[in-house]
Amino acid sequence: MMASMNDRGVVLTIKAIRRQLAAMPNDLYLIRLIHSWTHRAFPGERLWTAAQLLDSETIGFLRVRNREGWDLYMQPHARNQNAGYILVDLDHADAQVVEQMRRNGHHPCLVLQTSPGHLQAWVHVSMTALEPCIATTVAMQLARDYGGDPASADWRHVGRLAGFTNQKLSRRSLAGYGPWVQIVHARAGLAPQAGALVESAMQRWRPLWLATDSSHPSQLGMPSAAAITLDQATAIYQDCMQRWRIAQRFSPPDWSIVDLWVARHLLSEGMPAPEVQAVLQLGSPQFPRRHGNPQDYLHRTVARAAFPPRGGPVWVPPALYRRVTR
């Protein structure tokens, strides 16, 4: 039976969620439920607007699941990209860490206490969506700087949803109750040094060949023959084709588009740009096909994959943005 709006617990939960969403404005939010005992995910993925998430029936549904042992997680959603918010999981942290973040211009827009001595901070670093490789690099830097959990430092990691209890057995009191996930700080806005964080990450990932046009390929980070084998490149490329059912869906495929999809996918998985280029060079069917300047084509394809035009993201197969990790 769904809890009514007169239930004081529901009202407190709604207030907490409203504060959290106000600190992290976005069009859609991914909500994920993970069972504290079995560690399995609740069937289905839920993408809700702020209004939908704050609906009394939605809140009632989530509260019932929480009482049944499900932990609630959320992330601002941007399909196959990061929405501009980075999670820093601060295990065994105190307020001094948050103050240090502020002194360095990495002001969190939201800080949660997930249990006594355990904090999660969200840092707003971009008003536009970020490529996975860029967001992951920013997350790793913040985790290193402030002692965050490196296992949580990636572009798609979800954080706790305020207003519910932490159902982990290790966090429960002697009486068996889970601690409430509480908001310590909530204030929307970009971190003052957000631009520097993103720029640093972009420099880390920007293909070296973009810096100069006159250097020899071996000086530009071009993959050597030993960097990746023909069999490895072919296996990687064919795996992408099979998972996306390219041959069944497109006859014949536009290989330049498939190359771009493969490059974006591999970059999002953390593969260095030179190795991505090698996969395309060795694994793309009949390469170099009719390209007059094959090396320039590879340069431009990987650069476009890493830094899509500002006018909008390049479409990718749905399989690339359906996965979300804990």
Q: What is the predicted role of each segment?
A:
Residues 35, 116, 163-166, 188:
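Residues that form or immediately flank small-molecule/cofactor binding pockets and catalytic motifs
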